[in-house]
Amino acid sequence: NEDLSIFEYVFCWLGNTDLLLSIIKLIEDKMNLEHDVGAGVQMILLVEDSIRFYSSILPNLYKFVLQQSQEFATEALNAQLETLRMRGRPKIVLARSYEEAWALYSKYKNNTLGVISDCRFPCEGKTDEMAGYRLLSAIRREDQFVPLIMESAESDKAELAEKCNADFIDKNSKKMYVDLRKYILKRFGFGDFVFRDPDTMEEVARLRNLKDLQDNIFNLPKESLLYHISRNNVSRWLCSRALFPISEFLKHITWHSLQDIDAHRQIIFDAI
């Protein structure tokens, strides 16, 4: 019941030494967010008010993002570009109330790589068990395709996640962090680009890097390419690799504006 309002963040030591690095990175990300977003860097928004839980999830989240950034950096042509790739990793920002989360999303919505939110947290000064659902629903109305993940200790909240087209993670699950990494890898544009058949969702192609995309862009099935283009998946995949100029360019070449799949193939090829 102590008043902790004088502190920027309060953490709970759970024995994971990675927490120390996470604290440093979290403060760095908050301080650099305004500047880096101007250069195209993306934001991962974490909404969680439980000190114990965000002290546990942040080390896992940072470890995963940093590992992915190191892998992407190896695709760079020289040491300078490798450093730029590392610096361009997504920034992780923590919000602990509805108002704080909505303010961050509203300001940086065009640079939001994805949102991970609890279901129960403060709204208008009071704990609200539906705050997460209302937040994710509001974000979904703003952006039809931004990846959303709802996490809760109440398994029945999975129905609410489905209503706002978000993935659901059970906080009580022993494999919670395995599920979290799986969803982030699949939804946020990390890892290989897996092209899928929109009807069966079966894998039709797997591309590991930019060269693979350029080499195979004219061979990808029309329906699969259209599915991913219409959901900004290509742009998101490039963003996660800190390829901001290409990503920003392709983000504005939408299917609704062009409606020519062969022209899209050529534009992607030329942009790379």
Language-model features: locations:
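A short, hydrophobic beta-strand element within the central beta-sheet of small alpha/beta folds
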Residues: 1, 8-12, 48, 115-117, ...
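Conserved acidic segment of CheY-like receiver
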Residues: 40-52, 57-82, 92-94
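Acidic catalytic/metal-coordinating carboxylates
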Residues: 97, 125-134
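Terminal, compositionally biased segments used for targeting/anchoring and flexible tails
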Residues: 156-272
